[in-house]
Regions:
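Bacterial N-terminal signal peptides that target proteins for export
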Residues: 2-12
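Bacterial N-terminal signal peptides
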Residues: 11-21
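N-terminal segment immediately downstream of the Sec signal-peptide cleavage site
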Residues: 26-77, 163-179
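Predominantly extracellular/secreted and cell-surface proteins with exposed
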Residues: 49-136
Length: 179
């Protein structure tokens, strides 16, 4: 009987700790800021996958259930494309390099297993001008584990953004959490 109680406690305590940390984050009236890096590849295309890299930041707006998100992303055809499709020529001009600024204002914050998500409509630029894929639905999922409560981020674009970034989540890392 004691071993069943111990096993039950061993299973429930980590869940309660994670729920408590998320609850404390959600109930704190101060704004919480998270930031990190996206480091991903788009799905395979006829020209090859794109490398997608850049910094992001997210601000949880206290108890409002809202958040603001921004990312500055660089995209270029991958090294794999250079080796298989471009005869090993690493000329940056041939790699289709471009930038995107992604902004989501007043996104809705909801709890998910192991963290939270922010969803809403994002504005997207390409090389500083409006992108034809803007506006697009965007879901940002921030998760973690028992040692690091918020360690991972994943960005998933809806159409028309998914036509450019792909339908799979773009992974990244949480580097900093500030309260």
């Amino acid at each position: 009987m004691k071993s069943k109680a111990f096993l039950w406690a061993a299973r429930i305590i980590p869940v309660l700790m994670l729920a408590g940390s998320i609850s404390a984050l959600a109930q704190d009236s101060r704004h919480t800021k998270l930031s990190g890096l996206v480091n991903a590849y788009s799905p395979q295309t006829t020209t090859g996958p794109y490398e997608i890299r850049g910094p992001w930041s997210l601000e949880l707006k206290g108890r409002s259930g809202k958040a603001n998100f921004s990312a500055a992303l660089n995209m270029e055809l991958s090294d794999g494309w250079v080796l298989t499709k471009n005869n090993g020529d690493f000329d940056p001009n041939a790699r289709g390099a471009h930038t995107h600024h992604v902004t989501l204002v007043n996104g809705d914050v909801t709890l998910v297993s192991g963290g939270f998500q922010v969803s809403g409509t994002a504005t997207i630029t390409v090389n500083g001008s409006p992108a034809p894929i803007s506006p697009s639905p965007l879901v940002i999922v921030v998760t973690g584990g028992t040692d690091v409560a918020f360690s991972n981020v994943a960005l998933t674009f809806g159409s028309p953004g998914s036509n450019h970034f792909g339908t799979e989540a773009l992974p990244g890392v949480v580097r900093r959490v500030e309260k």
